């Protein structure tokens, strides 16, 4: 399952990356 993306992050694959 993909992790929930918190505010300030964006889903990228199976993890969340910082949305710059």
Curated annotation (Swiss-Prot):
Post-translational modification remark: Contains disulfide bonds.
GO molecular function, one term: toxin activity
Tissue-specific expression: Expressed by the venom duct.
Record has Amino-acid biosynthesis as a keyword: no
Keywords (A to Z) from UniProt: Disulfide bond, Neurotoxin, Secreted, Toxin
Annotated compartments: Secreted
Keyword Signal: no
A GO CC term assigned to this protein in UniProt: extracellular region
Name of the featured protein: Conotoxin TsMEKL-02
Lineage: Eukaryota, Metazoa, Spiralia, Lophotrochozoa, Mollusca
């Amino acid at each position: 399952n993909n992790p929930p993306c918190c505010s300030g992050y964006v889903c990228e694959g199976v993890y969340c990356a910082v949305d710059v």
